[in-house]
Regions:
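Short metal-coordination and nucleic-acid-contact micro-motifs, chiefly zinc-binding Cys/His arrays
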Residues: 190-196
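Short Cys/His-rich metal-coordination motifs, predominantly Zn2+-binding knuckles/fingers
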Residues: 201-204
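Conserved phosphate-interacting/catalytic interface
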Residues: 1-190, 235-587
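Short microdomains enriched in Cys/His and/or Lys/Arg
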Residues: 209-245
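Short, solvent-exposed secondary-structure capping/transition elements
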Residues: 207-211, 268-269
């Protein structure tokens, strides 16, 4: 299903003229042009690199150009057509292995003769003449190369160019005769390959022995990683080798890898969260869909010129099945949409999840998630929404050396949000541990508690307790949380400037075993009330009386279950935020 969806995406891009035909890589980083004359002599070395913004500064980066399809190299010698590094095009490098460099150059020359022999093109003849006359031993001292030799050997890719006698010049990759010759060679390259019925297209075709590499996944090898590979006998069946174990045609292998590489290269289509790289796309290949989706669950809309209010309005409309205009495009809630999560695993990629639904259904799931997370927030917290990464960070000790949340948690949380499924138990466990360790109920942690119990245990009682702001529920654990917040306030007012409050010593015991903590705290509060001015004493005494009246006659509960502790923590958070809100209004 993944490969079929990616192949269909490639074919849609091909119809729209946004990608090259099979046999060509649409975007490949090229640093220099080797410009040749009619006799194959090197006329110039042209720097193709350009200035590109990177963060707040500008850097020099290679230019992305369409080039003939690249071979996947392991450890052997394998030449590319028209575009390669110095080892292949010049027969020299700084790796200290001149014999291997010579073999690379000879392999490259043989490939170009195989493709271009007999081609009626001045550029083709110039390239062949270059290979026939070039002296690799003199490459590093060539007057046109010596000054840039260090840069040329710093992982730079070079491409052939041609200059005619009248001064006109062009890249060999744009020469019509050369392109036609390469296309013919590529189309017949699998003539000797093993044939089988392709699992993606359903057609009999030559099977790809090794699939092209996937590049752009953070944490994977720089040379690329494989989504489909068989590198040990244990993975093979019925005597098949390599790609024959899962027959995918050369065309389909090229199509799905081209599509995925393009998505990974587009920051509007992919996002890294933890060790998971998320890639998303619409069936019609309109970029506005993936752009909007990443804004919905990763944030960052302001940087892309979309206000959070406009983003929220678009999400709500789509969740209700209404089309909206977004980024100069119209988003249709019925459009098929795909979300793929992949993680690096040495030379391979692991699929964390693959989801397919209508764009409107994804929007509804995200809207429901946002509604469950909604909770009153402190005045200093300006965030309208909490991103997936922000939620995962609430489970991490920010004082530890490793501040990254569990990769498994991030993947499970993403899946739950996008599918509308139950939140992972590890999310609740992580938040509960942090609250117990730090005795701090932050906005993020309170929002997670609220969302978790409303989604995983949608009882009427939970709907009554886990609300956006303070409510008058008589639920005992919730009332106890509010009571603890009031007791903490009484202590702070009676003893202004104290370094530690009852929260630091009693929060965990009051939350888990109220009967052991609250009698002591209530007695302590009576002493604190005696230190206050009359208006404050009357105000807080009234609050205490109202809350104590909602507790059972049997007294404080001996212990609270985990869900009841969640209600306690939400009650504490609500009451504390009410206090801060009132203080801000007075100021």
């Amino acid at each position: 299903m993944i490969l079929q969806a990616l192949t269909a995406y490639y074919e849609q891009l091909l119809k729209q003229g946004k990608v090259e035909a099979p046999g060509w890589d649409s975007k490949f980083k090229v640093s220099y042009e080797l410009r040749l004359g009619p006799d194959g002599q090197l006329l110039a070395l042209n720097d193709l690199r350009q200035e590109v913004p990177k963060g707040k500064k500008t850097v020099i980066a290679p230019r992305e150009l369409p080039v003939p399809h690249r071979v996947k190299r392991a450890s052997g010698v394998a030449a590319n057509f028209l575009c390669d590094n110095t080892s292949y095009l010049l027969g020299a490098d700084e790796k200290g292995k001149p014999e291997r460099s010579r073999q690379c150059f000879e392999a490259c020359a043989a490939l170009h003769h195989k493709v271009l022999d007999g081609v009626d093109s001045p550029a083709a003849k110039a390239i062949l003449a270059f290979f026939d006359s070039w002296n690799p031993a003199a490459a590093s001292t060539h007057p046109l190369l010596a000054e840039q030799w260090a840069d040329l050997n710093n992982n730079a890719n070079l491409v052939f160019g041609y200059e005619s006698p009248d001064g006109a010049h062009w890249l060999a990759t744009t020469d019509d005769a050369i392109r036609a010759a390469w296309q013919s060679a590529f189309d017949t390259s699998d003539a000797d390959a093993e044939t089988a019925r392709c699992l993606i297209t359903g057609k009999e075709a030559g099977i790809a022995r090794i699939h092209p590499a996937i590049k752009g996944v953070m944490g994977a090898q720089a040379a690329g990683a494989a989504l489909v590979s068989f590198n040990a006998p244990a993975f093979c069946s019925y005597g098949h080798e390599q790609g024959a174990n899962a027959p995918v045609s050369e065309y389909a292998a090229f199509a799905y890898t081209t599509a995925l590489n393009l998505l990974l290269a587009d920051r509007n289509c992919c996002q890294r969260i933890g060790d998971t790289t998320i890639v998303c796309w619409a069936e019609n290949a309109a970029p506005a869909y993936s752009n909007a989706m990443l804004m919905f669950f990763c944030g960052g809309s302001e940087a892309r010129g979309v206000s959070e209010s406009d983003l929220a309005a678009a999400l709500k409309a789509l969740s209700q099945g209404r089309p909206v205009s977004f980024l100069d495009d119209k988003l249709d809630p019925n459009q098929n949409f795909y979300v793929l999560g992949i993680s690096p695993n040495a030379a391979r990629l692991s699929v964390r999840f693959f989801l397919h639904s209508s764009f409107g259904q994804f929007a509804k799931n995200l809207q429901d998630h946002a509604d469950r997370l909604s909770i009153t927030r402190p005045a200093f917290d300006k965030r309208e929404n909490l991103s997936v990464w922000a939620l995962a960070q609430e489970t991490v000790n920010q004082r530890s050396r490793d501040k990254n949340p569990s990769p498994q948690l991030v993947g499970d949380l993403l899946r739950a949000i996008l599918t509308g499924g139950p939140y992972p138990a590890t999310l609740l466990n992580g938040v509960t541990l942090r609250i117990r360790a730090e005795r701090e109920v932050t906005r993020g942690r309170a929002a997670i508690l609220k969302a978790y119990y409303l989604r995983n245990y949608p009882t009427e009682l939970n709907k009554e307790v886990f609300t956006v702001s303070l409510n008058e529920s008589s639920n005992v654990p919730y009332v106890l949380g509010r009571l603890f917040s009031v007791l903490e306030t009484i202590q702070s007012v009676a003893n202004p400037g104290i370094n530690a409050t009852i929260k630091d010593r009693y929060f965990n015991s009051a939350c888990a075993t109220p009967a052991t903590a609250f009698p002591t705290l209530v007695k302590l509060a009576q002493k604190h009330l005696q230190k206050m001015s009359t208006p404050n004493e009357v105000h807080f005494s009234k609050q205490l009386t109202e809350l104590m009246a909602q507790l059972p006659e049997t007294g404080f509960p001996a212990r609270l279950s985990l869900p009841e502790q969640g209600a306690f923590e939400i009650g504490y958070y609500h009451q504390t935020q009410k206090r801060y809100a009132k203080k801000n209004e007075e100021e």
